[in-house]
Amino acid sequence: MEDCIFCKIVQGEIPSYTVYEDDVVKAFLDISQNTPGHTLVIPKKHVKDIFEYDEELAAEVFKRIPKIARAIKASNPDIKGMNVMNNNGEVAYQSVFHSHWHLLPRYSSDDEFKINFTDHSDDYASEDYEAVRQSIADQFKD
């Protein structure tokens, strides 16, 4: 894609701090470094978001993520965990519209990276869960 910054990185038009590359993906340090070692994994093929993946591309990208995550973790004994995140759509904080997976090493719960999961379970009755479940399950019917 002509104006895509990640496509330009794949094509070598823009430099990156590449940690891993093969014929399917490229993994490079996120310029923001939310935590030290914050790495992006992108498919070399331009897909905007998760909704554009076919099963083959999804399998090829996802099977590489654990290997890259293990290398990041092994690179620093202070890494205690890792968040693996993918944002899809502007409302979900996607800022570059070439699908990418964030691998965020975690050093402690005080490392400035925060995710806020709010518990809304008190707002849902059994019937509400069932209605949501049914709506999603219906999408798998032929």
List each model region and its residues.
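HIT superfamily nucleotide-processing domains
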Residues: 1-142
